[in-house]
């Protein structure tokens, strides 16, 4: 039976999706695909039966199992991504504790005072699993002390339980906090190759490194996974035969959660603490016939991708040369996780009372995004858990933070001075935009023309064609040129910018206005799609954003482009189709042209970033915990936007929660002193 399978894929892989459809169709088993915003959105779409299948990690399965992402969704895992080395293994890997055979220990309480070797902080078998299981057994104690952040409570507990250890990695995404934690709990770095660094690369870190630490650096117990134990001791692994090694497995034992010891050999089953389930393909309520047809086509698709060495094979199917898709009896995501004893590892927290970071917003779209972030980040171990609160406006949120009805809110940089003075706010985290922004994350707004243009001052813009990075709400594309033209008496009111130019493309403007006439909509597709996406303030509009405004200028649609410096400094000639840096010069507000690198004397104003504020009444530890949770989520999703599109347009809405061009979030320290000048910018430019 043939069944046309529709796969949902994150938008970032749209091109691979088209390629996959073409290649599968040419082989006689066409697979269709639709683009979701990210994997989270795809899980919702499969739940609503807009698509049949989505490729997922165990953490995504948790989202499907635990959050009502779609009414009446009957999610099932119908294929698993397994390794060719162990195609019959039930789990991707199993977590074990390994000890010296003659270690005097007969229960988990005996771990007290031992020297412990870990893969690395925040990792599964070397950190999350032992912490989760040892806490449940009452071995790790005082792990929910309200004086400390969730991460510090874990590190304190490990540091107290073990005499020494090696636990490398980034203990906090904030460098100052990272340093303090490593100094405070330095016994957990003592067994590392470089105790004073306690970070990768380190020969005693990772799965094999933990065993090396046990065998050769004085460790008593190593937390690692079965496959690496087998490799370390030269035992056969799946289809790979035994190999000679200088390590002797007879000198070591698996240490079991019940306190017993098990030999490390080819005949004895290891005792495990938990397992990480395989990744897989998740469908929604596929009946037996459909499930079989889908499995058959996915297996064919995996083979085709491998033969073609296609990009889509890796990005869309989560496969590589070491893995393959294996059909498995359909199982609910919850069962898939529980059979591996992995559910509590994902849900790991430091016990009651649970502390949520309550995030205040005043817009329905921001609430939707905040809730998605809260669910997704929790499944991927960002702590504290976020909770989202809707108030009527910025002032109400600042009051809520002041009065302990909320913990954090995101405000414009220009509002921080008022927030500090009137609501006892404390700025803790800022947006950052990468190359082309200042030390304090400001983005210079520029008027850009082509090299060789005869335009020599603001007055020359009258009745010209203009390209804007955005409309109302956009600093470089709207507020900065409007303010500058008004300051120079070329317009009386900012709204007159719409008629000052003869035609423009300012995505987000009313569709029937002059400000949309130069916009073109999506770059591919039919006229109907182009029309539907024209002048939208999202990447569907080819001329949207800073790089879009440059494309509009390069294509000869406009005479001038208003955009932030970041768009120029981050120009990728191949990818952006927006020309080269040397193709452009600046027009200065005081007249004349200037090269791009003289932007400091030739800009239309500096745009402040958005800032996350909390309450100055909170303890340093409470503020540190909030920073940790926010930065952990930012680090994760700035690197993996396919999991959750935290930075960029949210649906068809721009600048929801954060500005679209954010690269990641950074910690604010005492050197930040821009609040007064930013308040002046907000007042003068009307950019609020």
Predicted regions, residues:
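N-terminal hydrophobic or amphipathic helices and topogenic motifs
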Residues: 1-51, 56-59, 81-92, 103, ...
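Short, hydrophobic alpha-helical packing/hinge segments within bilobed ligand-binding/sensory domains
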Residues: 41-43, 209-213, 396-400, 548-552
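Extracytoplasmic/secreted cell-surface and envelope-processing proteins
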Residues: 43, 63-66, 106-108, 124-129, ...
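Alpha-to-beta junction loops
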Residues: 47-56, 69-71, 115, 216-224, ...
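Solvent-exposed loop/turn segments at secondary-structure junctions
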Residues: 60-63, 102-105, 121-125, 227-231, ...
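Ligand-binding "clamshell"
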Residues: 63-86, 232-270, 418-436, 570-601
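A conserved helix-loop-strand patch within extracytoplasmic ligand-binding domains
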Residues: 77-158, 431-506
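Extended serine/threonine-enriched, polar tracts that run as long, contiguous segments within proteins
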Residues: 203-204, 208-220, 229, 260-265, ...
């Amino acid at each position: 039976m043939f069944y046309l399978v529709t796969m949902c894929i994150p938008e970032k892989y749209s091109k691979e999706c088209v390629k996959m459809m073409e290649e599968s169709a040419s082989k006689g088993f066409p697979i269709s695909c639709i683009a979701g915003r990210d994997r989270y959105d795809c899980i919702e779409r499969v739940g609503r039966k807009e698509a049949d299948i989505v490729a997922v990690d165990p953490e995504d399965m948790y989202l499907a199992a635990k959050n009502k992402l779609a009414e009446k969704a009957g999610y099932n895992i119908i294929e698993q991504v397994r390794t060719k080395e162990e195609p019959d293994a039930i789990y991707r890997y199993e977590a074990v504790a390994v000890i010296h055979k003659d270690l005097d220990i007969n229960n988990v309480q005996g771990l007290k005072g031992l020297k412990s070797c870990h893969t690395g902080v925040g990792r599964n078998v070397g950190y999350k699993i032992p912490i989760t299981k040892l806490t449940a057994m009452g071995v790790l104690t005082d792990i929910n002390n309200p004086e400390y952040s969730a991460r510090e409570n874990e590190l304190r507990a490990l540091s107290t339980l073990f005499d020494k250890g090696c636990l490398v990695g980034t203990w906090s995404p904030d460098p100052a906090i990272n340093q303090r934690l490593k100094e405070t709990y330095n016994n957990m770095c003592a067994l590392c190759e470089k105790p004073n660094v306690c970070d990768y690369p380190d020969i005693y870190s990772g799965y094999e490194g933990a065993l090396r630490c046990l065998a050769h650096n004085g460790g008593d117990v190593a937390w690692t996974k079965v496959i690496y134990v087998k490799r370390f001791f030269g035992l056969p692994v799946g289809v790979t035969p035994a190999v000679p090694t200088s390590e002797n497995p007879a000198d070591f034992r698996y240490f079991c959660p019940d306190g017993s010891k098990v030999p490390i050999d080819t005949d004895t089953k290891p005792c495990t603490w938990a397992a990480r389930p395989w990744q897989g393909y998740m469908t929604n309520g596929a009946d037996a016939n459909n499930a079989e047809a889908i499995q058959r086509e996915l297996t064919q698709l995996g083979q085709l991708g491998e033969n073609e060495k296609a990009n889509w094979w890796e990005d869309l199917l989560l496969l590589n040369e070491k893995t393959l898709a294996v059909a498995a009896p359909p199982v609910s995501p919850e069962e898939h996780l529980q059979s591996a004893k992995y559910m509590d590892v994902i849900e790991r927290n430091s016990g009651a009372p649970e502390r949520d970071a309550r995030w205040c917003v005043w817009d329905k779209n921001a609430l939707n995004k905040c809730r998605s972030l809260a669910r997704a980040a929790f499944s991927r171990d960002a702590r504290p858990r976020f909770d989202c609160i809707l108030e009527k406006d910025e002032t109400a949120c600042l009051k809520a933070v002041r009065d302990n009805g909320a913990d954090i809110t995101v405000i414009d940089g220009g509002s921080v001075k008022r927030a500090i003075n009137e609501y006892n706010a404390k700025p803790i985290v800022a947006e950052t935009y990468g190359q082309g922004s200042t030390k304090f994350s400001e983005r210079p707004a520029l008027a850009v023309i082509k090299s060789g243009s005869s335009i020599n001052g603001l007055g020359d813009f009258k009745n010209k064609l203009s390209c804007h990075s955005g409309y109302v709400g956009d600093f470089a594309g709207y507020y900065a040129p409007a303010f500058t033209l008004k300051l120079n008496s070329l317009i009386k009111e900012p709204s007159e910018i719409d008629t000052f130019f003869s035609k423009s493309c300012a995505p987000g403007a009313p569709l029937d206005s002059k400000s949309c006439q130069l916009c073109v909509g999506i770059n591919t597709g039919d006229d109907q799609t182009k029309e539907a996406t024209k002048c939208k303030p999202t990447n569907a509009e080819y001329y949207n954003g800073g790089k879009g405004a440059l494309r509009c200028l390069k294509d000869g649609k406009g005479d001038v482009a208003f955009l932030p410096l970041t768009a120029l400094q981050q120009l990728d000639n191949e990818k952006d189709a927006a020309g080269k840096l040397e193709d452009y010069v600046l027009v200065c507000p005081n007249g004349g042209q200037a090269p791009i690198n003289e932007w400091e004397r030739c800009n239309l104003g500096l745009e402040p970033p958005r800032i996350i504020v909390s309450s100055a009444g909170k303890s340093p530890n409470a503020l540190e915990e909030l920073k940790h949770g926010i930065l952990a989520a930012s680090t994760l999703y700035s690197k993996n936007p396919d999991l959750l599109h935290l930075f960029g347009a949210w649906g068809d809405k721009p600048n929801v929660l954060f500005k679209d061009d954010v690269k990641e979030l950074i910690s604010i320290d005492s050197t930040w002193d821009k609040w007064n000048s930013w308040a002046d910018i907000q007042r003068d430019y009307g950019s609020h």
